[in-house]
């Protein structure tokens, strides 16, 4: 069944949730406790995730909690994901919609699968390793290779060079929310491959592997490269943006940042993009990175920033942030609702970052 038809049926079956979002524009709440969990389905990233099936439309949804491990108790992280989504979409970015959800005893964020059964998400890492098979993001010696120029070359290699504008838009979006973790698995393409072509490629790969005596472990990498070349696709909505908006700060630190302007400015200045710059792969402040990109893509950068300036409304941003948890059930608010102080800090961070973004045009 076509994705849009499934989405329409979901609206009919669950009208109250949809009506709530339409009337308020705020994130909805779902209790996914009784949704079936898809077994043996691994998802990448640093947070606890699982794939659950919505019984009302039989569509996969991704449920994520905050990072909770020794030394990194980032309880507000799932809120950062939801706020980033709401703010981004209010500013006209193509951001995946995230809502509030409960799954068993866990509370986190929920997003609908971006692709249909006939499609797949091809993450950036697939393009980068397909372009350069020596690149290994798990090897610290490769960290510095993850640069804007490396991404550009990989896109051009697979004849997707025009999508560099989408990468630039992501960098600009990240500068507004302060996202510091736009790694190779946090952007990608929704791709479609004809099943006959897929099987044909598989046969071709196996024949090549046998002929060239290629190790079995290397076959998958070659198969990915061959598959990518003929595929048609579109740039995926922006997703996995939760590493932002002071999600790592304790309540005590939040208070300090609100009271100390020097500490507040220093915190923003220290924020750097995961996408690096230059031959040395230097990590730059978000705004410094945009300025460097602007030297070669002035029209793209300027047009995007001007577009954001036209739609940016501080009152709308404030309303989103201070009402983000309004749909959270009362019995969960004591443990999971955001404090007014944290909301104020998030608001100030976005306003300050937006003002700095405007200065790029000067």
PLM feature segments, named:
Residues 114-171, 198-206, 210-217:
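ATP-dependent phospho-/nucleotidyl transfer catalytic cores
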Residues 187-189:
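Hydrophobic residue at the +6 position relative to the catalytic HRD Asp in the kinase catalytic loop
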Residues 17-134:
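Conserved ATP-binding subdomain of kinase catalytic cores across diverse folds
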Residues 180:
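Glycine-rich phosphate-binding P-loop
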Residues 2, 6-8:
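Low-complexity, intrinsically disordered or signal/transmembrane-proximal segments
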Residues 76, 194-362:
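C-terminal catalytic region of ATP-dependent kinase domains
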Residues 183:
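Canonical protein kinase catalytic loop motif
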């Amino acid at each position: 069944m076509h994705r849009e038809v499934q989405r329409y049926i979901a609206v009919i079956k669950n009208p109250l949730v949809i009506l709530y979002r339409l009337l308020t524009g705020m994130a909805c709440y779902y209790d996914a406790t009784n949704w079936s969990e898809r077994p043996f389905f691994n998802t990448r990233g640093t947070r606890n995730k699982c794939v659950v099936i919505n019984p009302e439309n039989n569509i996969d949804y991704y449920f994520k909690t905050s990072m909770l491990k020794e030394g990194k108790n980032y309880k507000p992280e799932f809120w950062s994901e939801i706020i980033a989504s709401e703010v981004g979409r209010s500013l006209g970015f193509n951001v995946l919609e995230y809502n509030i959800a409960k799954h068993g005893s866990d509370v986190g964020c929920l997003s609908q699968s971006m692709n249909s059964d006939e499609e797949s998400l091809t993450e950036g890492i697939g393009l980068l390793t397909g372009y350069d098979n020596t690149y290994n993001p798990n090897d610290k010696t490769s960290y510095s290779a993850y640069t804007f120029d490396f991404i550009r070359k990989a896109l051009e290699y697979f004849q997707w060079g025009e999508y560099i504008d989408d990468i630039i838009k992501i960098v600009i979006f990240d500068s507004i929310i302060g996202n510091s973790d736009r790694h190779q698995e946090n952007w990608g393409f929704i791709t479609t491959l004809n099943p006959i072509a897929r099987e044909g490629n598989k046969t071709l790969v196996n024949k090549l592997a046998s002929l060239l005596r290629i190790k079995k472990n290397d076959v998958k990498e070659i198969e990915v490269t061959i598959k990518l070349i003929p595929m048609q696709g579109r740039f995926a909505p922006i997703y996995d943006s939760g590493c932002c908006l002071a999600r790592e700060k304790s309540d005590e630190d939040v208070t300090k940042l609100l009271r100390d302007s020097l500490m507040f400015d220093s915190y923003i200045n220290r924020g750097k993009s995961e996408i690096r710059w230059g031959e040395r792969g230097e990590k730059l402040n978000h705004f410094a990175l945009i300025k460097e990109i602007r030297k070669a893509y002035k029209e793209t950068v300027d047009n995007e920033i001007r577009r954001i300036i036209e739609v940016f409304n501080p009152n709308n941003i404030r309303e989103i942030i201070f009402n983000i948890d309004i749909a959270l059930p009362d019995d969960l608010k004591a443990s999971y609702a955001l404090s007014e102080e944290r909301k104020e800090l998030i608001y100030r961070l976005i306003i300050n970052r937006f003002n700095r973004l405007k200065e790029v045009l000067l």
